[in-house]
């Protein structure tokens, strides 16, 4: 196995060197080069590249040696690596329960209890306040906590947001609700399921994941990071437990569900039963690296401004509960993204024209565990006096067809959209709107961790034109996050080369532009996450 790894690495390094372009010639993107990266990273040898596993370490070594062979500079304090320390935590034997007014519900019956990064038995008992959707946002004019005292209490809320918000704003707001609850002084969160969510995702599917461990990265003080300090317990309730929680309330759970289906914000109120959430977690420490390489900028005035190109290297690993094929190879998700990253790096090095701004290339860990590696990189920068001014994220292009259009998530919020338009036009690619707004994709990949820090970002998805809808949705329904996401899929490797080319053009335009990317003055994300940053007008 080691022989196979080093033989492939050496062969690809020689191939990269042999294909060097004459200075100033436009770089060539080939299906063969793109496929070579996916073929290695998606091989059974890497066992699905789960963060912290040996397979992931092999993938990280592959990327690092590719960076070295291309002549990049190491970007981490540990050479090519930024080691990310993690706590891996899970419920002991799946143990956990929620007691509502004296009635106990075992974990996975009608409740799901979240593990804690604090080892040992934990219990949180407190009164409960229903807070509607649990949103407190001045920017949106919403305050579900108005008139409610939740300090020291558990808050119960519906997932999601009221209807009518733009999909990306809704997804961001939903992801920020833990922080909002903590800011109000709550000690626990109970998530309720709307009738729509229950129909879309039955409880049996909610409990399929078993007792998979969660990851939380550790800060410099050795403590687990939390965006919601003070929240000590979390649980999700199915309908029987939710009905018990609303016993004796001014409105029943069924009435509240009906309101959620038809109305905007829902007025909250205190609930009668006291609730106790019990769980016992085991904790182990592990590390997993982000792999970082740098192409220094050629303009001394701009070289401290970095364009970040990022792709997650991790996958889902090996799942013993699966059938004969237990390995989640992650060929599409996200060997293709890493292949794009490597091909863009090669093209930039071989073009003979260094970009004016510097380029930080990052293959990050633990995306599948909640965008953890990207968040660690965003909050633990490696650039000294330099700063990231824009992010181009590369995550799971579905390469089963000759795509003719792309969706550029985030493009409408900043001047990065102009670079995407220009790059796409150069190779005859059209831009399309989001065909899957219900998925909230803008907040579900690594670039979002930099958006949260106030940095503009774009993330390209292959579009639905030219038969793409059938191929894309078919992959999501049949192969996404399954062992069948492997090299047996009918990849269109020419599409992979084209995807690398468009991202190369986008990154190059950003890196060589007179001005760094700016949020638009009317962008929700610019106003709320980068209020002091200079803005652009449309």
Give residue spans per PLM region.
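Bacterial N-terminal signal peptides that target proteins for export
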Residues: 1-7
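Bacterial N-terminal signal peptides
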Residues: 7-17
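Second-shell loop/turn segments in exported
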Residues: 22-28, 44-54, 69, 96, ...
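Catalytic-core environment of secreted peptidases
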Residues: 26-74, 147-149, 153-173, 178, ...
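Noncatalytic luminal/extracellular "stalk/propeptide" segments of secretory-pathway proteins
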Residues: 47-155, 159-163, 271, 283, ...
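Metal-dependent peptidase/peptidase-like ectodomains
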Residues: 103-108, 216-253, 364-471, 476
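Soluble metallo-hydrolase cores and metallopeptidase-like ectodomains found primarily
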Residues: 104-147, 224-330, 346, 350
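His/Asp/Glu-rich mid-to-C-terminal helical/loop segments that flank catalytic regions of hydrolases
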Residues: 346, 350, 461, 467-529
């Amino acid at each position: 196995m080691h022989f196979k790894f080093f033989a492939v690495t050496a062969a690809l390094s020689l191939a990269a060197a042999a294909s060097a372009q004459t200075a100033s010639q436009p770089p060539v993107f080939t299906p063969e080069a793109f496929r070579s990266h996916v073929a290695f990273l998606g091989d059974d040898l890497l066992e699905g590249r789960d963060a912290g596993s040996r397979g992931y370490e092999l993938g990280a070594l592959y990327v690092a040696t590719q960076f070295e062979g291309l002549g990049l500079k190491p970007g981490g304090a540990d050479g090519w690596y930024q080691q990310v320390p993690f706590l891996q935590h899970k419920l002991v034997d799946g143990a956990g329960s929620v007691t509502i007014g004296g009635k106990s519900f075992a974990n996975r019956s009608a409740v799901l209890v979240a593990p804690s990064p604090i080892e040992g038995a934990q219990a949180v008992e407190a009164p409960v306040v229903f807070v509607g959707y649990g949103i407190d946002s001045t920017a949106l004019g919403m305050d579900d906590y108005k008139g409610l005292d939740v300090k020291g209490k558990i808050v119960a809320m519906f997932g999601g947001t009221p209807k009518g918000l733009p999909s990306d704003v809704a997804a961001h707001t939903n992801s920020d609700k833990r922080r909002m609850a903590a800011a109000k002084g709550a000690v626990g969160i109970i998530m309720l399921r709307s009738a729509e969510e229950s129909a879309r995702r039955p409880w049996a599917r909610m409990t399929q994941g078993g007792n998979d461990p969660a990851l939380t990265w550790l800060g410099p003080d050795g403590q687990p990071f939390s965006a919601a300090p003070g929240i000590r317990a979390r649980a999700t309730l199915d309908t029987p437990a939710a009905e018990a929680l609303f016993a004796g309330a001014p409105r029943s759970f069924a009435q509240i569900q009906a309101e959620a289906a038809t109305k905007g914000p829902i007025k909250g109120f205190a609930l009668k039963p006291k609730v106790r959430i019990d769980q016992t977690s085991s904790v182990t420490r592990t590390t997993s690296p982000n792999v970082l390489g740098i192409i220094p900028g050629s303009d001394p005035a701009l070289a401290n401004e970095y364009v970040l190109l990022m792709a997650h290297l991790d996958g889902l690993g090996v799942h013993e509960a699966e059938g004969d094929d237990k390995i989640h190879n992650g060929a599409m998700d996200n060997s293709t993204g890493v292949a794009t990253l490597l091909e863009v790096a090669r093209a930039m090095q071989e073009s003979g024209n260094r970009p004016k701004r510097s380029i930080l290339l990052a293959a990050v860990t633990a995306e599948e565990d909640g965008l953890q590696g990207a968040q660690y990189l965003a909050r633990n920068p490696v650039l000294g006096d330099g700063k990231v001014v824009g992010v181009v994220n590369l995550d799971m292009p579905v390469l089963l067809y000759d795509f003719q259009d792309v969706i550029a998530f985030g493009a409408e919020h900043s001047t990065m959209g102009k670079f995407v338009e220009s790059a796409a036009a150069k190779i005859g690619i059209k831009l399309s709107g989001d065909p899957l707004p219900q998925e909230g994709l803008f907040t579900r990949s690594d670039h979002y961790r930099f958006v949260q820090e106030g940095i503009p970002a774009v993330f390209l998805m292959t579009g639905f034109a030219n038969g793409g809808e059938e191929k894309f949705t078919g992959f999501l329904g049949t192969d996404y996050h399954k062992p069948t996401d492997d090299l047996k899929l009918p990849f269109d490797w020419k599409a992979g080369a084209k995807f690398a080319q468009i991202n190369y053009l986008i990154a190059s335009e950003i890196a060589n532009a007179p001005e760094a990317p700016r949020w638009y003055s009317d962008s929700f994300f610019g106003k709320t996450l980068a209020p002091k940053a200079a803005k652009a007008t449309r």
